[in-house]
């Protein structure tokens, strides 16, 4: 993906916590590449117990790297003031990006109307259709390890994992109103590795670790 950024539109989803205490939730920022086939490919992420200013700083860092088409920020409960905070930071940093609106609103920010589990159930068909892909080269990264663990512990009755912060960033994908890039990006299944690989114009890059995804 990173070798072919021009073939994707990028989106950022978040779940920002308000405390760095050991008992607090994690702040999570997930970066996704969206291709012409409607697939979501995870490309980067941040997960840490920290004050919200550090998490917002991470959002801006990812924005500079990936130039996303939209950034999802939840505005419910204690997170209600995050949009204004980020808008003020845009002015201060002279860095501008689109804050995605919910499908039922024109205001910036994601406004959930159901509980966390119900929201995740709306994205579960994407997993079944193999439309959400996770990078094989990050399989040892703590961020992806946490995400895979949380996803694997979702049951029909609810979340069984201790934390659900990365799940929230996955659920937000259904609210991102994405648009597909004009460049076509095809993926080929490699039966030897069990991975989906991005077709690259440079044959030497086909099958490299950065091009390989698990679903």
Residue map of PLM features:
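RNase H-like, metal-dependent nuclease domains and their acidic two-metal-ion catalytic environment used
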Residues: 1-101, 133-215
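Conserved phosphate-binding/catalytic loops in two-lobed NTP-binding clefts
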Residues: 94-119
